[in-house]
From Swiss-Prot:
Keyword list, A-Z: Disulfide bond, Glycoprotein, Glycosidase, Hydrolase, Signal
Reaction catalysis annotation: Hydrolysis of terminal, non-reducing beta-D-glucosyl residues with release of beta-D-glucose
Protein name: Beta-glucosidase 8
Binding site for a beta-D-glucoside: Q64, H165, N210, E211, Y350, E421, W468, E475, W476, F484
Signal peptide: 1-33
Entry EC no(s): 3.2.1.21
Keyword Endoplasmic reticulum in record: no
Species assigned in the record: Oryza sativa subsp. japonica
Positions of the catalytic residues: E211, E421
Amino acid sequence: MGCAPAAHYLPGGGWRRLLVVVVALVVLDRAGARVRAADDDTGGLSRAAFPKGFVFGTATSAFQVEGMAASGGRGPSIWDPFVHTPGNIAGNGNADVTTDEYHRYKEDVDLLKSLNFDAYRFSISWSRIFPDGEGKVNTEGVAYYNNLIDYVIKQGLIPYVNLNHYDLPLALQKKYEGWLSPKIVGVFSDYAEFCFKTYGDRVKNWFTFNEPRIVAALGHDTGTDPPNRCTKCAAGGNSATEPYIVAHNIILSHATAVDRYRNKFQASQKGKIGIVLDFNWYEPLTNSTEDQAAAQRARDFHVGWFLDPLINGQYPKNMRDIVKERLPTFTPEQAKLVKGSADYFGINQYTANYMADQPAPQQAATSYSSDWHVSFIFQRNGVPIGQQANSNWLYIVPTGMYGAVNYIKEKYNNPTIIISENGMDQSGNLTREEFLHDTERIEFYKNYLTELKKAIDDGANVVAYFAWSLLDNFEWLSGYTSKFGIVYVDFTTLKRYPKDSANWFKNMLQASGPGSKSGSGTSDSQVGSATSASHPVGSAISSSHRLLLPLLVSLHFLFPSFFMFLSL
C-alpha cells in the first residue's frame, strides 16, 4: 500500500507540524551550506599542492597586539608618544591594550593551532627587554617572551621571531637620534645578541628587521611615521639625505647582528637568520622604453635598496647614478660584512602598481621619493589595476605575487624566500556579522596563494607563507579603522571570533598530502570550536541533520505534545 497511509497514524494533525520542522531544518541546512561553500572551496589548494615541508603561519607584531604598553617594565618606543598625540591616529586609537596578547597569548596560540597552521611569526618589543634600549634588562619582559616561545613550541608550532618591527626604543631616539647615528649599530647588535643567547636554544628562525624601507621613507622622507622627520617637518630633517643614512645604518646593524649570530650561536643552535622587506610589484604602464625603465627604477629604489647590498655588496646602479654623493657607501670591510648576510629573505607582498616615467621637475625639492622619477598609476585605459581594499594603497592584484617572487628569483639568483606577510583589510565600520563573513578575503587568499604556487612551480625557492594577520589589531596610522585579521576581535570584550577566512585556511591546511607534516591536523573539538564561533547554526545543522530527522519523526509518535508549540 506504500507509505502514504502513515500520515493517518500521526496524532492531532502532527503531520503538518512535522512538515514545519522538516522545512525549517532544510532551510537552516541550506543556509549553513551556503556559508560552508565559501569556507570549503579551496580553489584546488591544499598542503599537497606545495612542496614537502612548506610552512604556513600567521604574523603579528609586538606593538600591534601585545598591549601592556606602560606596564610590565616596558619602556616607551618612538610610537608611544606619537599615538597619544590627538589627530595622529585615525579615531585617536592607541596601542595601550590593543588585543591584549600579553595576557591572552595562550588563547591566541591555541586558536592558531586549531586552524591547522604550522608557525607563528611575532616580534619582540626591544623596549620590553631593554626599557632604555641598552643597559638594564627588564626581567619581566624577558620572562614574557620565554613563556610565549615555550607555549608556541608546546603546542607543536614553530616560532619565527623578528627583533624589530618599527618600534625603536624612545630613549635611543633621544640619545643618538635613532637610526641616524652609526652608534646604534652596536647597540642593536648587543640587543640582538642578548636575544640569541636567551631564546636561541628554542628559536631557530630569526629576522632582524621588518620593512626597514618604511622606517627610512615614512620616518625620514615624508615624516608621516615616527620620528616624523623630513625637510619641512617640525621635528627637523632632510628628505634628500636622511632616508639613505637611516637605511645604511639599518643594513649595517642587520649585518653586524648576523655576524655575531653566525660566529657565536649558529653552529650550536642550528638556526637561520634573515630580514623582512616589503615589495609592491611594479608593472610598466606601457611597453615604452621609458615606462619599462621607470618600473625598474621603482624596483631598485624599493626592494633593491636592500637586496642588492645584502646579496651583491653594493647599492643598485640606478640609485648610485641618481642619488650620487647623497648615497652612503660601504667600506671594503663593510661590503664584505653585508654581502651574503641573510640565510633567507622575508618578503611582505600585498599589492601592485603601474609605473610611468616622470622626469624630475626643475624646481622640485630633492627627496628619496622624488629620486624615483616615476608616477604611480592605478589604472590603465580607465580600468583599475585591481579592486581596492579598505586601505587606499592596497589594490588587490594577485598576479603581483607572481611578479614579485619571480623577479627576485630571476634577478638575485633564486635566494630562499619566505612570504612573511600577505593580506587585505576591511573597513572598521562593519557589523560583527559582516566582519565574520569575509568572502572577499577568502578570494584574496585563494588567488594570491594560487599565484604563489605558480611561482614555486616555476622554480622559485619559497619555503613558507605567513598571512597578515592572525588578529584584527592596531594598524599604525589607521588605528582600529582597518581590519586585516582572519580572526575578529571585539575590542570591548577582547573576545576572539574566527572569520570565514580563518575556517577557509583550516580546511585548506587540514588536507593531507606530501606537503603536510605529521600531527598537523586538529582534533574534532578544536575544529568544532573554531567553526561554531563564526556560524554556529550552520555548522551544527550540517553535521547532525541526518540524525535529527529520524529522531524528530520518532518523537512525534511518542510525545505528540512535545511539538504542540509549532502549531501556534
